[in-house]
């Protein structure tokens, strides 16, 4: 099986063309391939498939390193767009795709950045899903013997965002896994730790569902900005500084889609016997 290794700000992917290859990935095989000592090593596996709708260009599936399938991955979307152009599967700059979450339009810019229409953030608890009696801008949670204030939102996948004074000293490794599997998140959640530098700039670390802390999380950056705007902390255009680099997020508020712009890097091509 041929594959490519790619990354978006250090969030790394094994990308497989299932348009021209017949492939099947069991959870066990994905876990083996994801192992950084015994396999290829990656945060997520991206599988490119033919479209199910003639109006679309592709369908793609996203699997975490633990073998679980997820509906959305912002960094993966950008790598997907670069991959299909690099491999000659399309020469379009505006690429229409479907995922388990719905449809997206990805735009490759003249400077080889990728702009992704991530859709409108959904703050309804049932959409996240999150156990709450009603939608609030801020929720109070108990975890690890602490009282935590957070915002929750769906960006096609579940996110919890906590504001911290300094991301460098935030309890990502201890609080992240506790909140990820908290009983109020029946499908688990991605946990973002956000430091507001100013209204147009935040720093962010994300403990990803099924992957742990990663160098960058595109949907996590979108979630942090959406929650920050909802809570009146941020402007409509925000620079997000992650351990792996920078993303630019823009959202005009309710009734409008959120846009993410950032890089996608092709590292190498490989071949593996399954």
From Swiss-Prot:
Its EC number is 5.1.1.7. The record marks 159, 208 as: Could be important to modulate the pK values of the two catalytic cysteine residues. GO terms for molecular function: diaminopimelate epimerase activity. It holds the Pfam family DAP_epimerase. Pathway: Amino-acid biosynthesis; L-lysine biosynthesis via DAP pathway; DL-2,6-diaminopimelate from LL-2,6-diaminopimelate: step 1/1. Keywords: Amino-acid biosynthesis, Cytoplasm, Isomerase, Lysine biosynthesis. It is found in: Cytoplasm. The record marks 268 as: Important for dimerization. Substrate binds at residues 11, 44, 64, 74-75, 157, 190, 208-209, 218-219. One of its GO terms (biological process) is lysine biosynthetic process via diaminopimelate. It comes from the Bacteria. It catalyses: (2S,6S)-2,6-diaminopimelate = meso-2,6-diaminopimelate. Catalyzes the stereoinversion of LL-2,6-diaminopimelate (L,L-DAP) to meso-diaminopimelate (meso-DAP), a precursor of L-lysine and an essential component of the bacterial peptidoglycan. Homodimer. NCBIfam families: DapF. This is Diaminopimelate epimerase. The lineage of its organism: Bacteria, Pseudomonadati, Pseudomonadota, Gammaproteobacteria, Enterobacterales.
